Amino acid sequence: MRTCSFCNKEIEEGTGKMYVKKDGSIYFFCSSKCEKNMIKLGRVPRKVKWVKE
């Protein structure tokens, strides 16, 4: 199982989204909420209250 790159939630097989940047770094997201917060809004996970530690 993969974990979300933003909230560290486990992602089940066949769900979620993989985002690959031009530099080759790979991010896995469990929801569009996590994807938008990290990619579009540029938020840091440790500063967001709803993210698991």
Swiss-Prot record:
GO molecular function annotation: rRNA binding; structural constituent of ribosome; zinc ion binding
Q: How is the cofactor bound?
A: Binds 1 zinc ion per subunit.
Could you tell me which CDD domains the record lists for this protein? Ribosomal_L24e_L24
**One of the record's GO cellular component terms:** ribosome
InterPro entries, A to Z? L24e/L24_sf, Ribosomal_eL24-rel_arc, Ribosomal_eL24-rel_N, TRASH_dom
Question: Does the record bear S-adenosyl-L-methionine in its keywords?
Answer: no
Pfam families given in the database record: Ribosomal_L24e
Q: Which family does it belong to?
A: Belongs to the eukaryotic ribosomal protein eL24 family.
Q: Any idea what this protein is called?
A: Large ribosomal subunit protein eL24
Q: Which organism is it from?
A: Methanobrevibacter smithii (strain ATCC 35061 / DSM 861 / OCM 144 / PS)
